[in-house]
UniProtKB/Swiss-Prot annotation:
Keywords: ATP-binding, Cell shape, Cell wall biogenesis/degradation, Cytoplasm, Ligase, Magnesium, Manganese, Metal-binding, Nucleotide-binding, Peptidoglycan synthesis. InterPro entries: ATP-grasp (IPR011761), ATP_grasp_subdomain_1 (IPR013815), D-Ala_lig_Van_CS (IPR000291), D_ala_D_ala (IPR005905), Dala_Dala_lig_C (IPR011095), Dala_Dala_lig_N (IPR011127), PreATP-grasp_dom_sf (IPR016185). It catalyses: 2 D-alanine + ATP = D-alanyl-D-alanine + ADP + phosphate + H(+). One of its GO terms (biological process) is regulation of cell shape. Signal peptide: none annotated. One of its GO terms (molecular function) is metal ion binding. Belongs to the D-alanine--D-alanine ligase family. Pathway: Cell wall biogenesis; peptidoglycan biosynthesis. ATP binds at residues 128-183. Residues 102-302 form the ATP-grasp domain. This is D-alanine--D-alanine ligase. Gene3D superfamilies: 3.40.50.20, ATP-grasp fold, A domain, ATP-grasp fold, B domain.
């Protein structure tokens, strides 16, 4: 028995609530198996009062999306002086903003795709850049709201400027990078293996590919040239450090090897709250390094701190 009381924060009120519940449930059960005293908290607007009364030794942040990974819950935990997992206030807020995170990563020497930051209503009926391109909400995760505009489309999709759009006014319009989906995790100062994601029946690594069993396969370590492998690892660690991440992060990449095995590698984004569901990438990447799911979670709990 470790004796540590761990509050697992899950659920919340973002569009990623179902993912968070899946992550939190898996993490809580495994931490109990490891000997921790676990309290499951389905986060609502009164979470600060709940945590202040509970006084756990550590908060395991299994939240995803706004409030959970944008610096908000991190600020609550800092104020309450409860050590917590993953990145701190500033790094979380920065990583959640895809545009600003890209600029910081690029300034540190990481290769990124050309992009524009726009209000979605500015797009209208004219292409903001030559297709193909991708439109992404600036502050969403799990591929919510991602729209791929193909070369043969004469106008941007109407959904972007319609009333049905629920992902905020700011969008990132980014050059579409063809090729393979690759990802790389960082655990503290240790860069992990590179993993290839192969969506099954999907154009890209969308919500279903991420969370539906059998909708994607993970090849870890990825079957790519050693120099490309090392380049991706270097870029993942550079982005992790430049943005100020702590604990575990995961960077996503596109590798265009259509014309050469030594093709272009582009960093897409960093995730400071990577999923911990049964189909998630980080547990698979850790497993390839000989680290079990339980060992990974224990490391995260012991790594928890304030002033992150």
């Amino acid at each position: 028995m470790t004796g540590k009381h761990v509050a697992v924060l899950m659920g919340g009120f973002s569009s990623e609530r179902p993912v968070s519940l899946s992550s939190g449930t898996a993490c809580a059960a495994t931490l109990e198996e490891r000997g921790y005293c676990v309290t499951r908290i389905d986060v609502d607007r009164n979470v600060a009062s709940v945590l202040a009364e509970l006084k756990p030794d550590v908060a395991f942040n299994a939240l995803h999306g706004p409030f959970g990974e944008d610096g908000a819950i991190q600020g609550v935990l800092e104020y309450l002086q409860i050590p917590y997992t993953h990145s701190g206030v500033l790094a979380s807020a920065l990583a959640m903003d895809k545009d600003r995170a890209k600029k910081v990563a690029a300034a540190a020497g990481v290769a990124v795709a050309s992009s524009l930051l726009l209000n979605r209503f500015e797009i209208g009926t004219e292409h903001p850049m030559e297709p193909p391109y991708v439109v992404k909400p600036v502050r969403e995760g799990s591929s919510f709201g991602v729209v791929i505009v193909k070369e043969d489309q004469t106008h941007p999709p109407q959904i972007i400027s319609s009333a049905e759009w629920n992902y905020g006014a700011e969008v990132l319009v980014e050059k579409y990078i063809p090729g393979r989906e690759l990802t790389c995790a960082v655990m503290g100062d240790r860069v992990m293996d590179v993993c290839e994601i192969i969506p099954v029946g999907h154009q890209f690594y969308d919500y279903d590919s991420k969370y539906v069993a059998g909708a994607s396969s993970h090849v870890c370590p990825a079957k790519i040239l050693p120099n490309i492998y090392q380049k991706i690892q270097t870029m993942a660690l550079t982005a992790h450090r430049a943005i100020g991440c702590r604990g575990v992060s995961r960077s996503d990449f596109r590798f265009d090897d259509r014309f050469s095995d030594d093709g272009e590698v582009i960093w897409l984004e960093i995730n400071t709250q990577p999923g911990m569901t049964p189909t998630s990438l980080v547990p698979d990447i850790a497993k390839a390094a000989g680290i079990s799911f339980g060992e990974l979670l224990s490391w995260m709990v012991e790594d928890a701190s304030c002033l992150r």
